[in-house]
Amino acid sequence: MKLHLYNTLTRTKEVFNPQDPANIKMYVCGPTVYDNPHIGNSRSVVVYDLLYRIIIKIFGKKAVKYVRNITDVDDKIIDRAELLGITINDLTDKVTREFHINMEYLGCMLPTIEPKATEHIDVMIEIIERLIAKDHAYIADNHVYFDVLSAPNYTELSNRNLEAMFEGVRIENSKTKKNPQDFVLWKPAKKNEPENINFTSPWGLGRPGWHIECSAMSYKYLGQNFDIHGGGADLIFPHHTNEIAQSRCAFPSSTYAKYWIHNGFLTVNGSKMSKSLGNFITVRDLMDKQIQGEVVRLFLLSSHYRRPLDYNDKAIDDAKKTLDYWYRAIEHINVQKVDLPSNFMRSLFDDMNTPLAIKIINDYAKCVFISKTEAERKFNASAIITCANFIGLMRKTQYEWFNRDVDEFYINELINKRLKAKKQKNWLLADKIRNQLLEKKIILEDKSNYITIWRKE
């Protein structure tokens, strides 16, 4: 049984043949940390978390290097920090922490490496200098631009002609550009900007363009060639197209990534969920409603990853009912881990066909309720928990699941927030959190050394 993945670059479903089975390399575009992630952003993280699990199953964890970056330098970050009246570092640290909390809530594994853009400026400068030396980039009006027309096969990933690619795309106008489509590799500092958002370079004080960041970090940790590059379908153009162009031009012998995997949009009433449209729901919103993270994860896996997925209350409720059914099926059964069933693995090996994988788990649940012997019930229940665990679900006990008013993740997060408030002598906030938990019949007991325990009333 071999893993098949749809490769956007070739527009075909291919057998996954890594360059080195003992050293598999995967890069996924991570968040720009200017605001709390919405669940559309989180779909990408959950999809590639599943792919990571599948590849680990085949090749072993030590053989897989999974890099997911943090973009912590960007005009949106600058604008947001100014709007909130806080420093860039305070904003990016806060949003990065929130991102990690969200991913834990969704049951995502940590990547092998999570590099920050601001810590790799030297690598970006090195690649830009290579591009200038090879006449693929030029300096104009204190900017460094990439010359799009100098890149061979620029349209290969998008499979569209150059004019069509740029229709409806916002292009930065500059009389000094060679071509309107040329994109920025390095931009100069603006007047009255905070000093810590700009960096020294051969072209003066400034900061990198967005696209060069991922080329630099993938090169730093994975080299010139690697196996998988993942991200949302909205990144095919311009971000991934520009990544390929600048990386291949900087390293002419490089093919860059072999397999390009893209997940579909999350929609709301048929429109793409996005902050610019104002139709987004953050992961924090769902956490505050005390919707279980497993429910959201199952919802995000309920549609094939390449298809659009529409967010609505019914879809969330359906995911909750499905998990209720699974947890009820294993109730009062001494389940044990068994080998992953071959039909279940075949579904995941077929371009991560999660709808089929979920149906197979449902079928095992049905079998539990019609099983004629205890051995049959135990086998089917064990298959449920084994399959669900593999895709990051059913991480709770039946007691924890069916006592949803006691969400330990939510409670512990509030306790940590309260402890922080106490250390800062913010007694008003500390009391507010205590009362908030008391309303849910959660009693806090403060011990020495800032330790707090809790119990249900």
UniProtKB/Swiss-Prot annotation:
Similarity annotation: Belongs to the class-I aminoacyl-tRNA synthetase family.
Cofactor(s) named in the record: Zn(2+)
Pfam families hit by this protein: tRNA-synt_1e
Stored Gene3D superfamilies: Cysteine-tRNA ligase, C-terminal anti-codon recognition domain, HUPs
Superkingdom, natural source: Bacteria
Motif 'KMSKS' region: where in chain: 272-276
Motif ('HIGH' region): 31-41
Lineage of origin: Bacteria, Pseudomonadati, Pseudomonadota, Alphaproteobacteria, Rickettsiales
Name assigned to this protein: Cysteine--tRNA ligase
A single GO cellular-component term on record: cytosol
Binding, ATP: 275
Catalytic activity: tRNA(Cys) + L-cysteine + ATP = L-cysteinyl-tRNA(Cys) + AMP + diphosphate
Gene that encodes the chain: cysS
Sites where the protein binds Zn(2+): 29, 214, 239, 243
Molecular function terms, GO-annotated: ATP binding; cysteine-tRNA ligase activity; zinc ion binding
Record keyword ATP-binding present: yes
UniProt subunit comment: Monomer.
Record note on cofactor: Binds 1 zinc ion per subunit.
InterPro entries linked to this entry: Cys-tRNA-ligase (IPR015803), Cys-tRNA-synt_Ia_DALR (IPR015273), Cys-tRNA/MSH_ligase (IPR024909), Rossmann-like_a/b/a_fold (IPR014729), tRNA-synt_1_cat_dom (IPR032678), tRNAsynth_Ia_anticodon-bd (IPR009080)
Organism in which the protein naturally occurs: Rickettsia prowazekii (strain Madrid E)
Subcellular location(s) of the protein: Cytoplasm
Keywords: Aminoacyl-tRNA synthetase, ATP-binding, Cytoplasm, Ligase, Metal-binding, Nucleotide-binding, Protein biosynthesis, Zinc
Gene Ontology biological-process entries: cysteinyl-tRNA aminoacylation
Major subcellular site: cytoplasm
Entry EC number(s): 6.1.1.16
